Every structure is written in C-alpha cells, then in structure tokens.
Amino acid sequence: MTRKARTPKAAPVPEAVAVVEPPPPDAAPTGPRLSRLEIRNLATITQLELELGGGFCAFTGETGAGKSIIVDALGLLLGGRANHDLIRSGEKELLVTGFWGDGDESEADSASRRLSSAGRGAARLSGEVVSVRELQEWAQGRLTIHWQHSAVSLLSPANQRGLLDRRVTKEAQAYAAAHAAWREAVSRLERLQASQRERARQIDLLAFQVQEISEVSPDPGEEEGLNTELSRLSNLHTIAQAAAGGVELLSDGDLNAAGLIGEAVRALNAGAKYDETVMQLQNELRAALESVQAIAGELRDVAEGSAADPEALDRVEARLSALSKLKNKYGPTLEDVVEFGAQAAEELAGLEEDERDAGSLQADVDALHAELLKVGQALDAAREREAEPLVDSLLAVIRELGMPHARMEFALSALAEPAAYGLSDVLLRFSANPGEELGPLSDVASGGELSRVMLAVSTVLGADTPSVVFDEVDAGIGGAAAIAVAEQLSRLADTRQVLVVTHLAQIAARAHHHYKVEKQVEDGRTVSHVRLLTGDERLEEIARMLSGNTSEAALEHARELLAG
C-alpha cells in the first residue's frame, strides 16, 4: 500500500523575481561563527590569514584561481580524509587553523589540522592535542559544508527519509528504541533455537576454561616476584657460603675487622684524653665497630637460614609452571589470561541464562513485536502529518528558484518486515515540469534542479550549525533563477554565517562581504591569494563575472546588481 502526502497546486509563473534588501552586515548568527581562517602550504596557497565577516560571504575568482581550496581547508577542520596531495609541492607540511567567535582572536575557540608529507598528522582544539574524531565531533556542531556535488546525497532514500524524520524526532526515537529491544529479544531466541548439542558443547568448554583459570587464580603482577624467589631458592648454598665468608672476615676469623677496629679504639685511649679531634675519631671508630658487629650478626643469620629448602623450591616451580601453562593456552600474557577468563565467564553466564529463560523468551518476543507495531504505526502517522506542511514549505522556496511548476510528495510504502527505521519506506517523488508524472527524485531531477532542492532544504529546515558553506550551489542556473538563489542565501544569512563559492554575479552582488581569489606567479611558482573587495574593485569584479570585461555597459549592469 502506498500513501502519499498531498501535493500543492503549481504556482503561476512569476513575471519577475522580486529582490528584497539583504539583512544588515554581520547579522547575528545563532552561535559563534567562523571569524578567522589561517592556511599554510595548502595547494597553491602558501600563507593566508583571512578575517571573515558574519552574514553572507561570497568567494569569487576565475576558474582555477583556487576557490575550492578554501572549502578543502574547511573540510580538513571537519575531520575530512587526510589527503597528503594537498600539501604544497616542495613543502613538508600544511596547517589549517580556524577561529570561532566574535572576531576577538584572544577569546575565540580554535581548531587546527596539520598534515605532513611523511604521512603524519595532528589535530588540536584551542591548542590541546585531540584525535581527528574529537575534532570532527567538535567542528560538526559549528560548521556545515554543502560540497559542489553534495546535492546527490538527496538521491539516497535514507537521506530523503531523514528530511521528514527531523520533524518527528520523538516518534522516530521511540521506534528506534522499540526496534532495538525487539531485535535483541529475537537474537536471544535465535541463539536458543540453535543446536542443543552445540550449545551444550559450548557450555562444557567454557565451564572447563573458567574452572581451569579460576583454580590457578593468576595475578598479572606475580611472575616477577616468583622468578626472584626462584633465583634465591636455587642458589641458597652460594648465599650461605658468601654470608659465612663475610662473618669470618668481619668477626670470627683469627684476623678480623671487628678485632682490628677494637685495637685501634684502644690505641687511641691515651691521645683522646688530651685532644678533642682524636676523641671524635675514636668515637667514630666505636660506631664503626658496632656497625661491623651488627652486620656480622645479620650475615650469620643469613648463613644459618640459607639451608636448602626443596619444598619451597618445588612450590615456586609448580606455580610458575601452572602460570606458563595458562599463558600458552590463553595468553600470551597473564593479563590476557585474566581477560580471557572474564570473557569466558560472561559468555557462560549468558548461555546459562538463555537456558533458564527459554520458556518465557518467546512470549517476550511476541509482546515486543506488538509494541513495535504500535510505535511504528504512530511514527507513520506522524510522518504523514508532517509531510504536507514540509512539502508546502519546500515548494514555496523551490518555485522561487526558477521552477514554478515544481511538485513534490513524500510517499510512504509498507515494508514486509519492520526495519530499523520504521514500518514503511519513505521516498521523495518530484516533478519540475508541468504535465510530467511525479517520479523518484533520483530518476527525474537534473543536477541544477538537485542543487536548488538542496538549497530549499537548507533554507526551510535550516542548517544545524552557525556557519554554513555552499560550494558552487549555483551550478547549472542563471538569470532569474540565479537571483532567486541569491535571495534564498541572503535569507539564510539572516540567522547564520553563509559562505558561498560562486561564479554568478547575481549571487556575489547580494553578499555582505565579497572575497576574491586570485592566482599569481611569484618566483616562477603559482600562488593563490584571497582579499576582501570593496568599492570600485568589487564593482569591477561583478562586471567581470557578468561579461568577462569591465566595459561601461558591464559596469552599469554591475551597479544595478549591487544596488539591489
């Protein structure tokens, strides 16, 4: 069964596209905007420090000047693939840094990405080293890029469904939770329905492994101490001989250190009565004598206590052997053995729980499936309810973008089995021309039409970030449609910073800030520069974009565009 949202009637063809005054420059975005971009050694850019205004910012320049490099740089800050071919030829590394804030660099948040020709890279947030994934998560909340060909993402049924589900997040999340619970129960039931013999074999194996490890109860840190003790027990005879020899020399021998020191103490008696220095030295010798006697006593204890202990040696060797056996089977380290034992115990507990729960699990699956159908029907109802106003809003913009006869609908078709995203497929059907049947967007829309639909989506649903980048959004359009695209971009810039790479004068003329990308040859090498255009320079650039020259007629046309 296919259910379709109502398609509004086509609007009449407008005689002219009205152009309203753009919002004031630096219109406040919904959050911190991209205020500064620094690029070093990226493609044809050697060094760039670019201050970015708020509102609508346009980047223009001749083909090949390097406009796309700006977008490539921002893509790196979004955690894009590390393409080391972007590093300028002859340089060891590239660096891109973006600052988000009100223009005060000292108080701005920053993100940077460094790539080296050696294949290494680094990402930082406000100076702190982070992973590329952390950089990506941070930047995705601040910057969105609509790449030159990203409009093709609208061809994906999942993305088409996502447009609608952004308006039914509560119902979509409830369905996702219900589906996850149902699938988990189904998976457990399927495990139970597997071969009883195989499950019993697995339980026996896991039980043996858990018992074998638990009986030894290995401690990952015990091997070092055991090896030290093994070395001591294996050399008790040598230890006893060494200690006895020390005792002989210190106190027990015919000529020993204690005796000689004692004689020295006595020899100093006469002089110590009359000289304080001699007395001090005599006292030090007495202390040395006490120390030697104490050491001799301890060595005597060592010698007497170092008798062979074969039982202790056997215990240590047996413990090391047991640990070695476990490492050979479950290692290679004791840490691995302990981890294996924990995982085996967890898996064993799960299998044993499955055995106990076999009687009630089918009932759980049935109940969860019934709940899933209920929640799925609520999701379909919400999608149908929201589809019509969303289509109305999208078509209102699309028709202003030079497609006055455009029609559109979200078609829901029931699935044979519940999917992770719902009980129905969602397909965006579209027609740009009168008399043509609605068809899948992927089959009937041209590249230019896709770009305008994407722009309508961005305007109606809004970008999720305070800064939005459009790379060649104007591909395949001109004339009144170009003016309409400029108007929509200007509207989007009311609440967000909008950065647009464009080749159309109609769009560049509506920008609050106009940047030109130029390519020059310096010292025999191509270098790209970016500068902010104002006054006559901007007028001449608009004229060049219109006519390829700065004739008086082109300049007059440019003045008209800039005047609005």
From Swiss-Prot:
Keywords: ATP-binding, DNA damage, DNA repair, Nucleotide-binding. Residues 10-20 have a biased composition (Low complexity). GO terms for biological process: DNA recombination; DNA repair; SOS response. GO terms for molecular function: ATP binding; identical protein binding. It comes from the Bacteria. InterPro entries: DNA_recomb/repair_RecN (IPR004604), P-loop_NTPase (IPR027417), RecF/RecN/SMC_N (IPR003395). The keyword Nucleotide-binding applies. May be involved in recombinational repair of damaged DNA. This is DNA repair protein RecN. It comes from Deinococcus radiodurans (strain ATCC 13939 / DSM 20539 / JCM 16871 / CCUG 27074 / LMG 4051 / NBRC 15346 / NCIMB 9279 / VKM B-1422 / R1). The gene is recN.
